[in-house]
Amino acid sequence: MDTSEPLEEGDRTHEQRPHTRSNPEGAEDREGLPQAGVGSRSEGEGEAAQVDDPLPTTTAVPTNCTPPPTLEFQLKTPRVNCPEKVIICLDLSEEMSTQKLESFNGSKANALNSSQKMIEMFVRTKHKIDKRHEFALVVANNEAMWLSGFTSDPREVCSCLYDLETNVCESFNLEGLFNLIQQRTEFPVTDNVQTIPPPYVVRIILIYSRPASQPALNLTDNMKKMLQCPYFFFDVIYIHNGSEEEELRWKDIFSFFSGLDSKGTSYKYEVSITGPALELHNCMARLLAHPLQRPFQSHAAYSLLEEEEESPESEVTV
């Protein structure tokens, strides 16, 4: 005869409730679970990482969506909405003036005009989210040139945005861009990366359109230090010609940019210049998220429902 006593209510196996509107992300189920340390993230949402010399001079990661890095350990930063210093770098190569993008009304548009419009919408929307955000505008021909200094007034940035012309460019000096930013920008430092929020973060958004030219870059120690900084992010929107003949070439260039992200915290997008302009705008809209609060790019989902398949026509643009 079984004389064992029935289990008390507290001894029963913890049975989690489904994620519902009244129970977001299983909030009530976390009461009995061990809490994470201050400033830590859930698994898969870590921020900066440190490894011994993770950035060789030549880097390549052959993937369109870089997976989270497999590193020995990751530095986790507080998920705070601190001010951003956003440096928007716009490529002015002749490819940007090609009339191949499909605009919203069915006519053809060039990448420069579409980029100018989406940059203005991005700056104005970020300003509405947090008026402490600051923006700077850099244009790139053969060399990078600082066009507008840091300002929290969107009108100052937009006033410099539209009087631009494309040029025939031989190469893109990415090293010169990094040096220019290091000269003009002070990177924040905190006593404890995991628990103390930074006063601000620095982010570059590079809009690049040179299918046959890989940027010239010789990584110096200062550049490696900048790329490994937990408060620095290097987002890229790469506009390529989309031709099958040059597919391997533009994929190599995209892999080059992916390989610069040793922390796995930056976002990289590739867009065909023969596709819809909506796709280009959607990429910029996805960059509205604060870099300290967004997940790894491979973990990001933009559908309202998990089973809903993502389609360009159904996405929301700013």
From Swiss-Prot:
Cysteines joined through disulfide linkages: none
Query: Where does it sit, as one GO cellular component term?
Result: BRCA1-A complex
Q: Where is the region VWFA-like?
A: 86-287
Q: Does the keyword DNA damage apply?
A: yes
Keywords (alphabetical) are: Cell cycle, Cell division, Chromatin regulator, Cytoplasm, DNA damage, DNA repair, Mitosis, Nucleus, Ubl conjugation pathway
Which residue stretches does the UniProt record annotate as biased composition, category Basic and acidic residues? 9-18
Matching entries from CDD domains are given as: vWA_BABAM1
Q: Disordered: where is this region?
A: 1-67
Superkingdom of this protein's organism? Eukaryota
Stored InterPro entries = BABAM1, vWFA_dom_sf
Q: Which residues form a coiled coil?
A: none
| Location of this chain's protein in the cell | Cytoplasm; Nucleus
State the protein's purpose: Component of the BRCA1-A complex, a complex that specifically recognizes 'Lys-63'-linked ubiquitinated histones H2A and H2AX at DNA lesions sites, leading to target the BRCA1-BARD1 heterodimer to sites of DNA damage at double-strand breaks (DSBs). The BRCA1-A complex also possesses deubiquitinase activity that specifically removes 'Lys-63'-linked ubiquitin on histones H2A and H2AX. In the BRCA1-A complex, it is required for the complex integrity and its localization at DSBs.
Give the comment on domains: The VWFA-like region is similar to the VWFA domain. Its presence reveals similarities between the structure of the 19S proteasome and the BRCA1-A complexes.
Family the entry assigns: Belongs to the BABAM1 family.
Q: What is this protein called?
A: BRISC and BRCA1-A complex member 1
Q: What is the lineage of its organism?
A: Eukaryota, Metazoa, Chordata, Craniata, Vertebrata
Q: Please state the gene responsible for encoding this protein.
A: babam1
